[in-house]
Amino acid sequence: MITEEILKVLLEDCEKAYFEKEIPVSAIIVDKDNNIVSHCFNKRQQNNRVIDHAEILSILEASNKIGDWRLNGYSMIVTLCPCKMCTEVIKESRLDNVYYILESKYYNSLSTSDFTKIEVPKEYEEKLNKLLTLFFDNMR
């Protein structure tokens, strides 16, 4: 399910978010053949909109590409377990599956039973964790 290409795009998007002073979270939506349909990172600061989380932006981009808000037959891979707001948008979009890499240490997310935690090569998990840690450490 999770290819090297997907992991690289997720990491690259997290790095872009970090350097743009955004929380380094990214999301990808893939079709049933694992083709990337959309990918985004958080842009709350950049766009000055509280709702511009990676998950929501990826859903909007995918919906625009396929011409339908219903994302049946598509799956999302996100670097951090989605927050409550994103969880509700994900449910409304009708994605078939949502996979996440990291648990959230920084805020309470909904029950993770709605989503599937996936194991990725340790190097990716460590890099993603490091970006989040650096981001939040630099905020203080």
Region locations from a protein language model:
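Immediate flanking context of iron-sulfur cluster ligation sites
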Residues: D68-L80
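A short, polar/charged loop-to-alpha-helix boundary motif
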Residues: Q46-I56
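Zinc-dependent deaminase
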Residues: M1-E20, P82-R140
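Glycine/small-residue-rich phosphate/adenosyl-binding loop
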Residues: S38, E55-N64
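Short beta-strand scaffold segments in enzyme catalytic cores
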Residues: V25-N34
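Short beta->alpha transition motifs characteristic of CBS
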Residues: S38-R44
